[in-house]
């Protein structure tokens, strides 16, 4: 999906060398025309390796989006981890969500999703994320397994006052 609302379009060709979603929060998600889009109101990180960043520092963009080209939304695996205590022992349960459920929860304002780390193989990207909500549990780790896809980053401006 081409987006003419943004000045810059960057493919994720360098696996985090130039652009990264680490610690970036999405408060809205959409899926249309086989594009899974995460809206990032506080932008994402641009490293000094990027041609547009002459600051020699890792800085944020302003509001931006990142798109993943996905053939079938049903192919995305969402694993949500919940920690709890039972009989004095700490346990972690794993719940499988479909992507539609995550989209609904984020878009309803019940939670946001924070990207923590990316792992990329020849057949998928796995994102380690955090689901943050205003009600208990306030924080749950999750994994997004997105099949063989590339990310495209859309943004307008660097915010040189927002350094890593």
Task: Annotate each predicted stretch with a short phrase.
Residues 1-164:
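Surface-exposed, interaction-prone regions used to assemble/regulate multi-protein complexes
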């Amino acid at each position: 999906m081409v987006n003419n609302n943004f000045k810059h379009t960057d493919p994720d060709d360098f696996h985090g060398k130039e652009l990264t979603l680490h610690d970036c929060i999405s408060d809205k998600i959409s899926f249309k025309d086989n594009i899974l889009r995460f809206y990032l109101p506080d932008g994402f990180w641009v490293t000094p390796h990027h041609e547009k960043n002459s600051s020699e520092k890792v800085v944020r963009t302003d509001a931006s989006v990142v798109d993943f080209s996905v053939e079938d939304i049903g192919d995305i695996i969402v694993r949500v981890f919940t920690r709890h205590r039972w009989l004095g022992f700490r346990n972690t349960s794993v719940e499988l969500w479909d992507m539609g459920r995550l989209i609904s929860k984020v878009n309803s304002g019940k939670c946001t999703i924070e990207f923590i780390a990316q792992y990329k193989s020849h057949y998928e990207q796995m994102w380690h994320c955090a689901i943050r909500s205003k009600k208990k549990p306030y924080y749950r780790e999750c994994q997004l397994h997105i099949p063989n896809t590339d990310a495209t980053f859309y943004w307008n401006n660097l915010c040189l006052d927002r350094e890593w």
